[in-house]
Amino acid sequence: MSATRAKKVKMATKSCPECDQQVPVACKSCPCGYIFISRKLLNAKHSEKSPPSTENKHEAKRRRTERVRREKINSTVNKDLENRKRSRSNSHSDHIRRGRGRPKSASAKKHEEEREKQEKEIDIYANLSDEKAFVFSVALAEINRKIINQRLIL
């Protein structure tokens, strides 16, 4: 029977001023009929009775923190710093931003890469002289001939 004995739980209690009975803190009234007044209601009643002064108004209102705004100082140093920051941001704008969220599909990424390659490809042989082009073509022909001969042996 000792194993099944319930564990004693201590509750937060308050005592009733009329009957000295222990009542749970969450209860607003005692079984004897006494009603506990909450601190919020007590403070509200006090503020209704006495008109609050300018100091009490600030205390009675809930304190709200406001965002502190810094004043901008007009100086050439600050302007130079702003210009530097802007120039950096412009240089970063060249990079393509990655899309946020879940990617649509893998094929869309491949299409983007192909587009980038097409845009980046520049004809490096456009400014090539005829003599250089002939030398390169002869070199390529020799390389191709060697590769073909290797395949025939295997």
From Swiss-Prot:
InterPro entries noted in UniProt: C16orf87-like, UPF0547
Upper taxonomic lineage: Eukaryota, Metazoa, Chordata, Craniata, Vertebrata
Domain of life: Eukaryota
Family indicated by similarity: Belongs to the UPF0547 family.
Keywords associated with the record: Coiled coil, Phosphoprotein
Record protein name field: UPF0547 protein C16orf87
Entry coiled-coil feature ranges: 104-132
Residue segments, region Disordered: 43-119
Keyword flag Ribonucleoprotein: no
UniProt KW Phosphoprotein keyword: yes
Signal sequence annotation: none
